[in-house]
A protein has these predicted regions:
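Amphipathic, non-membrane alpha-helical segments in soluble helical-bundle scaffolds
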Residues: 50-61, 87, 91-94, 135-142, ...
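Short, contiguous alpha-helical
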Residues: 2-45, 80-122, 161-214
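A short, mixed-charge helix-start or loop-turn motif at secondary-structure junctions
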Residues: 46-53, 128-132, 169-176
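Short, contiguous, helix-prone interaction/anchoring segments in small proteins
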Residues: 40-79
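Weak global preference for isoleucine
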Residues: 25, 32, 38, 56, ...
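Acidic/histidine-rich alpha-helical segments that form the ligand environment
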Residues: 59-72, 107, 123-163, 181
Length: 214
């Protein structure tokens, strides 16, 4: 996740479609301002209170489905292209997101269940996923992350407002249920990058008379 994330474009069709299934996640994501997280933190706090975990879990599943659906529209060449963050490829960016979404929710679950390790390592943000991964493996990574999230979210239920020791260098500290929601916000940041890449491929001049994407 980059601290210099671009502000969302609220007129994107995919955004409105996703918001129907993930209103809290997309609503919090809309609060992002370039380089600042104060607005999204406020939105996350207001939407991830007591009793929110089960609803947020369903929304995370919808976001995971949207990620996989978008990945499946991309041509093979896209996964080695710039991924919209730092110098990562698309494959590295989505591999990063798959690991991050599971890790953030697992952190909330460990804190909620009283199992936070005393020797927990310092969080290192913006770690790229593996190089050279293709469509099928990225889809599997997202699916595996969602299974981890589903198990972890069950431990957060009833503990959404509990404090979590996770101290993220870019976000700071959030409560257990807030990490569940923020994982989805982070997903949508990368989903936006994927849509921009898909649009750029779709709109580039065709060299063989065929559309590039879609």
């Amino acid at each position: 996740m980059s601290a210099a994330a671009q502000a969302p474009t609220v007129t994107d069709d995919w955004t409105a479609e996703l918001e129907a299934d993930a209103p809290d996640i997309v609503g919090a994501w809309r609060g992002i301002e370039a380089g600042q997280f104060i607005s999204v933190r406020r939105e996350v706090r207001s939407r991830a209170g007591a009793g929110s975990a089960e609803a947020i879990l369903a929304q995370l599943e919808a976001v995971a489905d949207a990620l996989v659906a978008t990945i499946e529209t991309l041509p093979d060449e896209a996964f080695a292209m710039p991924g919209g963050e730092a110098d990562w490829t698309v494959a590295e960016a989505i591999g990063h997101d798959a690991a991050a979404r599971a890790g953030l929710v697992l952190a909330g679950a460990l804190a909620a269940s009283g199992r936070w390790p005393a020797d927990a390592p310092t969080v290192v943000p913006s770690v790229a996923g593996p190089v050279g991964v293709g469509r099928d493996e990225l889809a599997r990574k997202i699916a595996r992350s969602q299974r981890i999230i589903a198990r972890s979210a069950g431990q957060i239920v009833g503990h959404e407002a509990d404090p979590c020791p996770l101290d993220h260098p870019l976000v700071g500290r959030l409560r257990c249920g807030e990490w569940l929601l923020f994982a989805g916000v982070h997903d949508v940041m990368h989903l936006q990058q994927l849509h921009r890449i898909a649009d750029s491929l779709r709109n580039r001049p065709a060299t063989d008379g065929r559309p590039s994407v879609g």
